Curated annotation (Swiss-Prot):
[4Fe-4S] cluster binds at C353, C414, C417. This is 3-isopropylmalate dehydratase large subunit. InterPro entries: 3-IsopropMal_deHydase_lsu, Acnase/IPM_dHydase_lsu_aba_1/3, Acoase/IPM_deHydtase_lsu_aba, Aconitase_4Fe-4S_BS, Aconitase_4Fe-4S_dom, IPM_dehydratase_rel_enz, IPMI_cat. Its EC number is 4.2.1.33. GO terms for molecular function: 3-isopropylmalate dehydratase activity; 4 iron, 4 sulfur cluster binding; metal ion binding.
């Protein structure tokens, strides 16, 4: 009998009941809430006269709608200009107070983006099932946890029952072997993977990322990789547990301690795929061949190395692909065969649940140190992923490096990743962004998003156009 994959093990650990229609009932260990997808769920509980099944399994924080300027944050919820945004943040506070759920409110130093806060607090632990009303919940799979996004109706189901109806996925292994070149990061790995398999490549699969290059990554780098599993079509991304995982979790507020810690570690050490486990699909990449990546189009799969040129639709024989390239070039305002390094930028955004952790800010600051944001850049934002990340960065003096270079140093939140708060692009503007999606209008109506790593974003800010960051780090 073949061994089990990590995904198989996690599924079996949480299986409550297999149903005749092929679906199953699985138990949920951790539920993370934010202000956008939770209001209707809480209202559903009230209408049904229910209470959360396990209050202690839930934590919450506002992130999507919160303003990131210090002036707006000092004014509290009342200072949020947009009426809908203000109402959503206020409603989360009220719902968490009413139902007794732990919430890190807008001006709590522990507040931040849900997928930064969960791991930071130790609320995400190896072997858990973790859900949140946000598609980038796959981030938490970096801890060997089965984590994925859910819809608003499912948020209510989890609150009420601590269970979820789901169908088991297929297994995909993405194996990245070798050593990454200097200046090439976890973000470049995952963009290269998406460029290789496409945004539908992982459909119906849970992706396990493995290989020496993945093992060499820090936990924060692994979170970046798992975060963008959904852009590769997979709801779930996973990395096996190792000593780095255990060291990261130890001593965090929600982590077990004393005897329970030893018991937990003994369990966690088995959260790896068996040597003889079988995967439905295997994809292999050579880390040494990966270069700094830049997305050029309106889908994360439209990505190239920084030294390449955007495609020419005339050279594409497939009429569907040709049409897709033509539409993307038109929206992005680019020419066929235009060099990536010839793309003029208007704004730079360093932040989001993909790249706003302390390691990301250190990488960007290393590039920004002693340099100035180019005069052609209208705005360069640095938005830490949480108040604790911001606090740590300020202790290290990273804020001063950014401010002296001409960047704006902001308060934590989702910020310019999506146009749900005051940080957004104007129509026609090009932005080098460390976020995860470059769809039409994602950062603002008519805005043009280019996905890059934090180091590449900082390099673009000081150069005014894309440049291979390795030229600045040499």
């Amino acid at each position: 009998m073949a061994g089990k994959t990590l995904y198989d093990k996690l599924w079996d650990m949480h299986l409550v009941k297999q149903r005749d229609d092929g679906s199953a009932l699985i138990y949920i260990d951790r539920h993370i809430l934010h202000e956008v997808t939770s209001p209707q769920a809480f209202e559903g509980l009230r209408l049904a006269g229910r209470k959360p099944w396990r209050i202690d399994a839930n934590i919450a924080t506002p992130d999507h709608n919160v303003p990131t300027t210090r002036t707006e944050r000092k004014g509290g919820i009342a200072a949020i200009a947009d009426e809908v945004s203000r109402l959503q943040v206020q409603t989360l506070d009220e719902n968490c107070d009413d139902f007794g759920i732990t919430e890190f409110k807008m001006n709590d130093v522990r507040q931040g983006i849900v997928h930064v806060v969960g791991p930071e607090q130790g609320a995400t632990l190896p072997g858990m099932t973790v859900v949140c009303g946000d598609s980038h919940t796959s981030t938490h799979g970096a801890f060997g946890a089965l984590a994925h996004g859910i819809g608003t109706s499912e948020v209510e189901h989890v609150l009420a029952t601590q269970c979820l109806v789901a169908k088991k996925m297929k297994n995909m292994l993405v194996k990245v072997e070798g050593r990454l070149p200097a200046g090439v990061t976890a973000k470049d790995i995952v963009l290269a993977v998406i460029g290789r398999i496409g945004t539908a490549g992982g459909n119906g699969h849970a992706i396990e990322f493995a290989g020496s290059a993945i093992r060499d990554l820090s936990i924060e780098g692994r979170m970046t990789i798992c975060n963008m599993s959904i852009e590769a079509g997979a709801r779930v991304g996973l990395v096996a547990v190792d000593q780095k995982t255990i060291d990261y979790v130890k001593g965090r507020p929600f982590a077990p301690s004393a005897e329970q810690w030893d018991q937990a570690v003994a369990c966690w050490q088995g959260l790896v795929s068996d040597a003889d486990a079988r995967f439905d699909t295997v994809v292999e990449l050579d880390a040494a061949q990966i270069k700094p990546q830049v997305s050029w189009g309106t889908s994360p799969e439209m990505v190239l190395a920084v030294d390449q040129n955007v495609p020419d639709p005339a050279r594409e024989s497939d009429p569907i692909k040709r049409g897709s390239i033509e539409r993307a070039l038109k929206y992005m305002g680019l020419r066929p065969n235009q060099a990536i390094t010839d793309i003029q930028l208007d704004r730079v955004f360093i932040g989001s649940c993909t790249n706003s952790r302390i390691e990301d800010l250190r990488a960007a600051a290393e590039v920004a140190r002693g340099r100035k944001v180019a005069a052609t850049i209208k705005q360069a934002l640095v938005v830490p992923g949480s108040g604790l990340v911001k606090e740590q960065a300020e202790k290290e003096g990273l804020d001063r490096i950014f401010i002296e270079a001409g960047f704006e140093w902001r308060e934590p939140g989702c910020s310019m990743c999506l146009a749900m708060n005051p940080d957004r692009l104007e129509s026609g503007e090009h932005c080098a962004s460390t976020s995860n999606r470059n769809f039409e209008g994602r950062q603002g109506a008519g805005g043009r998003t280019h996905l890059v790593s934090p180091a590449m974003a900082a390099a673009a800010a000081v150069n005014g156009r894309f440049i291979d960051v390795r030229e600045l780090l040499a």
